[in-house]
Regions:
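Low-complexity repeat regions of mature extracellularly deployed or surface/particle-associated proteins
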Residues: 24-174
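C-terminal segment of classical bacterial N-terminal signal peptides
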Residues: 14-23
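Bacterial N-terminal signal peptides that target proteins for export
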Residues: 1-10
Length: 174
């Protein structure tokens, strides 16, 4: 027995249910692209019953060895969660370069986290950077950490507190 009629019927049924989906399940998507010899940009938006999201990206170069790029995005969930990020990087003709970035997340039940930092290299090759991170659980426990690097030395500090603000031991990851 041939499976072709069954597959055609299944495809038709799938298409028919997609056409008649109620508005709450409708999906939307848009995309815009621009390009030139020196750079460009892309922007994308999506929306459906589960989430809404946006993201953007840009880049630019001058033909002399200097270039930069950036990207960002965000997401909002139907149940209250949200997240986002923002990053950029550059490179100069003299050999210096760097990058910066930040990100956040907010849970629907009260937890949240955020991080930000950057790293740079000067024309002589010296590298410096820092990053800080905070996270708070729905129960109020909080982690705060920072990392720095300079002259080849890496330093990390961290602290944890409970909802009352009392110091507690920071949990170790697996």
């Amino acid at each position: 027995m041939s499976k072709t009629p069954f597959l055609i019927a299944a495809a038709f049924a799938l298409c028919a249910t997609t056409l008649f989906a109620d508005h709450a399940e409708a999906r939307e998507r848009s995309r815009a692209v621009q390009r030139t010899a020196q750079g460009g940009s892309v922007a994308v938006e999506r929306s459906n019953a589960r989430f809404d999201s946006q993201r953007q990206r840009t880049w630019q170069a001058d033909g002399q060895g200097n270039a930069n790029a950036a990207r960002s995005g965000s997401l909002s969930g139907a149940h209250g969660g949200s997240a986002g990020y923002d990053r950029s990087a550059y490179r100069n003709a003299d050999g210096s370069a760097g990058r910066q970035g930040s990100a956040y997340a907010n849970g629907p039940n009260g937890g949240n986290a955020s991080t930000s930092g950057g790293l740079s290299r000067d024309a002589d090759g010296n590298v410096t950077g820092a990053r800080s991170t905070t996270a708070t659980g729905a129960n109020g426990n909080r982690y705060t950490g920072s990392t720095t690097v300079s002259d080849g030395t890496l330093v990390h500090t961290r602290s944890c507190t409970n909802a009352a603000g009392d110091a507690i031991a920071c949990p170790r990851g697996n």
